[in-house]
Amino acid sequence: MDPRSEVVLRQQQYLAIKILLINPPADELAQQLAHKHQVSVWTWNFADHQYFQHQSIQSDFAVTFPDQIPDQVIIFVPKSKELLSYLLHVVVSHLPAGQHIFLVGEKKGGVERASKQLQSYGKTVKLDSARHCQLWQTTIETTEQLKPLEQWLKHYSVKNENIQLEIYALPGVFSQNHLDIGTAVLLPYLNQIKLGKIADFGCGAGVISAYLAQLSPHNEIHALDIDAFALRSTEFTFQRNGLASERLHLHAVTGIQDAPKALDVIVSNPPFHQGIHTDYSASEGLCKTAKQHLNTSGELWIVANRFLNYPLLIEQTFGQCQVKTDQQGFKILYAKAT
């Protein structure tokens, strides 16, 4: 069991009947709490959502607060400070004064910093500190009027050759405030890819998806991500740039295995973080199995950190892998299915 969950169980006497777990790890906590409490989950991680559904736990995969209002919430501190600000705002917009918010997280994950954000809404006390984790409790004194989701968007401009886009990103989405270096290195090469049915794996705020949609009206874009906030951000990016919604197909995925088949192109600046932890499994899985989702002569384009040995993984399934460029610490890798 995750150490954060163990800390929650140590202080179970503080919990009310109806509990909402926000951003919990995929472990046995919800099932154990369900013996004495009515437990539900709000998560934006599709893999975690599927796990809880399989465990018969009520789970909402969403960017907004669930319809059923709990007595209390337990927030597992996210990596993003902005995302925690959003979560706290949403919670105090739905729960009345006097109810409790619990905040749990790892010390290395910034729980002490997060507890200071919690103090804005009421008297805050530390209930426990164990397993390199802390559990905090606040009694809500200050409630807020719910702000529209759009007010949480940040945006920035992307320009390359004749393409100009405004990128819109919700809290917690990769590279929310500016274009990341890897994608910037990739953009000049996107006009070389085949037209057709294209998957953007790990779409984030939709930079690559929107760019490809702007390049040609013949491109059918499939935006794939594990994160509900990323998928919603991509949708906002298309809307705000006047790109036809019928050309965008959003897919919540746990990995490339959930991607559509018969694709002409898979393009990706693949994710390599799960919360505060580094995790290369999704990107390595992409290198190994992308070919199964491509048509004959279909293409794979990947941004990779220079130190990662992805060319070898790609060569094992495609037979070859070209390095289109190597700059600013990133390689653009290309392979063609045969």
UniProtKB/Swiss-Prot annotation:
Q: Which Pfam families match?
A: MTS, MTS_N
Protein keywords: Cytoplasm, Methyltransferase, rRNA processing, S-adenosyl-L-methionine, Transferase
- Please verify whether the record's keywords include S-adenosyl-L-methionine: yes
Q: Report the CDD domains cross-referenced here.
A: AdoMet_MTases
Q: What is its main location?
A: cytoplasm
Subcellular localization, as worded in the UniProt entry? Cytoplasm
Catalytic reaction annotation: guanosine(1207) in 16S rRNA + S-adenosyl-L-methionine = N(2)-methylguanosine(1207) in 16S rRNA + S-adenosyl-L-homocysteine + H(+)
Top-rank taxon of the source lineage equals Bacteria
Which SUPFAM superfamilies does UniProt cross-reference here? S-adenosyl-L-methionine-dependent methyltransferases
What does the record give as EC number? 2.1.1.172
One CC-aspect GO term? cytoplasm
So what family is this one in?
A: Belongs to the methyltransferase superfamily. RsmC family.
**Entry function:** Specifically methylates the guanine in position 1207 of 16S rRNA in the 30S particle.
Q: What is this protein called?
A: Ribosomal RNA small subunit methyltransferase C
The organism of origin for this protein: Acinetobacter baylyi (strain ATCC 33305 / BD413 / ADP1)
At the highest ranks, the source species' classification is:
Bacteria, Pseudomonadati, Pseudomonadota, Gammaproteobacteria, Moraxellales
Q: Which gene encodes it?
A: rsmC
